[in-house]
């Protein structure tokens, strides 16, 4: 992502969006936009707009954050060891904008790969299926057909 474009986009973020994506903060569980979203669509990086997750892979993990079994394209996320807060975790970041997204844990549904991508709503923008074409994401309609 072009640095000037990224800087312009960062200026448009809310405080929570900026703190989550740029400072690796975590939003409060059960008090965020998408933890209980059941609409069909895709979730894109709030900074770059790159598609990251699909509602087809979303499930209620009971943790208070949107949870997914996998990203749409594994090449769009990168994982790093995270030793903050006295824990050993795996941080998930977006490749394009280097946004902190959340963490991935090995306690997801076993029949779907066993992973739980626990992602901050503040790092995402949701595009409903009926808006995919209008928003320029028409190639992703096929995953809902």
Swiss-Prot record:
Keyword Cell inner membrane: no
Catalytic residues identified in the record: 118 (nucleophile)
Superkingdom per UniProt: Bacteria
Family matches, as HAMAP family: MsrB (MF_01400)
One Pfam family, short name: SelR
Organism: Listeria innocua serovar 6a (strain ATCC BAA-680 / CLIP 11262)
EC number: 1.8.4.12
Protein name according to UniProt: Peptide methionine sulfoxide reductase MsrB
Biological processes per GO annotation: protein repair; response to oxidative stress
InterPro entries for the chain: Met_Sox_Rdtase_MsrB, Met_Sox_Rdtase_MsrB_dom, Mss4-like_sf
A GO CC term assigned to this protein in UniProt: cytoplasm
GO terms, molecular function: peptide-methionine (R)-S-oxide reductase activity
Record-stated family: Belongs to the MsrB Met sulfoxide reductase family.
Catalytic activity: L-methionyl-[protein] + [thioredoxin]-disulfide + H2O = L-methionyl-(R)-S-oxide-[protein] + [thioredoxin]-dithiol
UniProt KW Lyase keyword: no
UniProt KW keywords: Oxidoreductase
Domain annotation MsrB: ranges: 6-129
Transmembrane annotation, as ranges: none
């Amino acid at each position: 992502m072009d640095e000037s474009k990224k800087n312009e986009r960062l200026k448009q973020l809310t405080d929570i969006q900026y703190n989550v994506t740029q400072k690796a903060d975590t939003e409060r569980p059960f008090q965020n936009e998408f933890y209980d979203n059941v609409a069909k669509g895709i979730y894109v990086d709030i900074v770059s707009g790159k598609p990251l997750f699909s509602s087809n892979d979303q499930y209620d993990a009971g943790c208070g954050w949107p949870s997914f079994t996998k990203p749409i394209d594994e090449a769009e996320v990168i994982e790093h060891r995270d030793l903050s807060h006295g824990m050993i975790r795996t941080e998930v970041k977006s490749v394009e904008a280097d946004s902190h997204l959340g963490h991935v844990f090995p306690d997801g549904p076993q029949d779907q790969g066993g992973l739980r991508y626990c992602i901050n709503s503040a790092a995402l923008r949701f595009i409903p299926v009926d808006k995919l074409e209008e928003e320029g994401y028409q190639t992703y309609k096929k995953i809902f057909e």
